[in-house]
Swiss-Prot record:
Active site (catalytic residues): D11, D130
Gene: hisF
Subunit structure of this chain's protein: Heterodimer of HisH and HisF.
PANTHER family found in the cross-reference section: IMIDAZOLE GLYCEROL PHOSPHATE SYNTHASE HISHF, IMIDAZOLE GLYCEROL PHOSPHATE SYNTHASE SUBUNIT HISF/H IGP SYNTHASE SUBUNIT HISF/H
Stored SUPFAM superfamilies: Ribulose-phoshate binding barrel
Enzyme class: lyase
Descriptive protein name: Imidazole glycerol phosphate synthase subunit HisF
Family of the protein in this entry: Belongs to the HisA/HisF family.
EC number: 4.3.2.10
Primary residence: cytoplasm
Length: 251
């Protein structure tokens, strides 16, 4: 069985790492280059870098910042934000990214998933899905959770799986930043539905939450931001704990 992955996420706004609760009220959380280096040294399995203003403000992800982060880490590196065409992917891979994460652009133009998978390989294409549990089910949102779409989480995840995405990064907007645990029921449904790995995002507050998302949510990887950025959970201690709980992680 593949080892479960622990993935710190850097949300970048104006060149700084920030972390909000429920997608608003952003507060600064440090220099992305320093944080990336620290996580790499601490044994994080991967790093995710999201330019959270890129899609909304039509800005291209800061290529030079990607280069600086990539130069300071030795773990797989996923970059997202404002990726709309193959040339964006090319630019970011050349800057040192290993994978790209697409979200709003995939919903607006689903063929982009097929194109990236075909041109660069499925392993490069991570489709991020921001969804919120509503009365009618899990609805997908665009532009950092600002715009509701007519797509539903499970249908959309299945579609991008079929189109050639290599992984799904699912953020529950109901759980994001609240620190009450991941959306394990929805994650477990995704795991059963899909043939590709699922990364859980939104809700980590303590080590037990990571254990539960692997055991109950059947997630392949767990992503978190604030608990790492503010030193509430240290990655070596988290991995030791998970190991003791019978979860297969890379120590």
């Amino acid at each position: 069985m593949l080892a479960k992955r622990i993935i710190p996420c850097l949300d970048i706004k104006d060149g700084q790492t920030v972390k909000g609760t429920n997608f608003v009220n952003l507060r600064q959380a440090g220099d992305p280059v320093e944080l990336g280096r620290t996580y790499s040294e601490q044994g994080a399995d991967e790093l995710v870098f999201l330019d959270i203003t890129a899609s909304h403000e039509g800005r291209k992800t800061f290529t030079d910042l990607v280069k600086r982060v990539a130069a300071n880490i030795n773990i797989p590196f996923t970059v997202g934000g404002g990726i709309n065409e193959l040339s964006d992917v090319d630019r970011l891979l050349n800057a040192g990214a290993d994978k790209v994460s697409i979200n709003s652009s995939a919903i607006r133009n689903p063929d982009l998933v097929d194109k990236i998978a075909k041109h660069f390989g499925s392993q490069v294409c991570v489709v991020a899905i921001d969804a919120k549990q509503t009365e009618t089910g899990w609805k997908c949102y665009l532009n950092g959770g600002r715009i509701e779409t007519d797509k539903y989480l499970f249908d959309w995840a299945k579609e991008v799986n079929n189109r050639g995405a290599g992984e799904i990064l699912f953020t529950s907007m109901n759980h994001d930043g609240v620190k009450n645990g991941y959306a394990n029921e929805a994650l477990s449904t995704l795991a059963d539905l899909l043939t590709i790995p699922v990364i859980a995002s939104g809700g980590a507050g303590c080590m037990e939450h990571f254990r539960d998302t692997f055991a109950k949510g059947k997630a392949d990887a767990a992503l978190a931001a604030s608990v790492f950025h503010f030193g509430e959970i240290k990655i070596p201690e988290l991995k030791q704990y998970l190991c003791e709980q019978g979860i297969n992680v890379r120590l």
